[in-house]
Amino acid sequence: MLNHFNFKLKRDVTIIVPGEAFVSNDRVISTILGSCVSVVLYDGVRRLIGVNHYVLVKSDSVVDVLQKGRYGVYAIPMLIDAMIENGASKSNLKAKLFGGANFMAKGTIRVGVENSEFAVNSLTKYGIPVVAQDFDQSKSRKIFVFPENFKVVVEYPDGAKIF
């Protein structure tokens, strides 16, 4: 995790890397995604946001406790728990999902598709509505999550969108 002043935004930003998550009520949270997925959770009543960044759905071997955030099977429930520990109510949570790019040729390993499908299915299982998603393109993206309005700005190599 890196905290820095973003001159373009004119404010402090917390950047998370693969395997990390962060919860805040006042800081912009950012990360860069390819085939990885970030789940953005927010509680509009308690004014709280949380973002994770996972690499794969699961590991085929035993996972060290410090590496659990790299795998969706752990990263998603850990983010939900962190939101609740910081004052969110599970019944207020909503999700926005990003990443899941596929850079490989069709018919090969599709990590991005697996990651994005897992996120959607997991949040459905937890009863958290997905209100926006940006998946399955063959390009990277950088996201900025804003705590004051829960908007996510997604920057691509060739443009940007707001979710």
From Swiss-Prot:
SUPFAM superfamilies in the record: CNF1/YfiH-like putative cysteine hydrolases
Residues of the signal peptide: none
Reactions this protein catalyses: L-glutaminyl-[protein] + H2O = L-glutamyl-[protein] + NH4(+)
UniProt keyword list: Chemotaxis, Hydrolase
Cysteine pairings via disulfide bonds: none
A Pfam family the protein falls into: CheD
Recorded superkingdom: Bacteria
Any one GO molecular-function label of the UniProt entry: protein-glutamine glutaminase activity
BP term (GO), one: chemotaxis
Record flagged with keyword Hydrolase: yes
Name of the top EC class for this enzyme: hydrolase
Coiled-coil ranges (or none): none
The protein's Enzyme Commission number: 3.5.1.44
Gene3D superfamilies xref list: 3.30.1330.200
Family that this chain belongs to: Belongs to the CheD family.
PANTHER family tied to this protein: CHEMORECEPTOR GLUTAMINE DEAMIDASE CHED-RELATED
Function: Probably deamidates glutamine residues to glutamate on methyl-accepting chemotaxis receptors (MCPs), playing an important role in chemotaxis.
Protein name: Probable chemoreceptor glutamine deamidase CheD
Source organism: Borrelia turicatae (strain 91E135)
Gene (name only): cheD
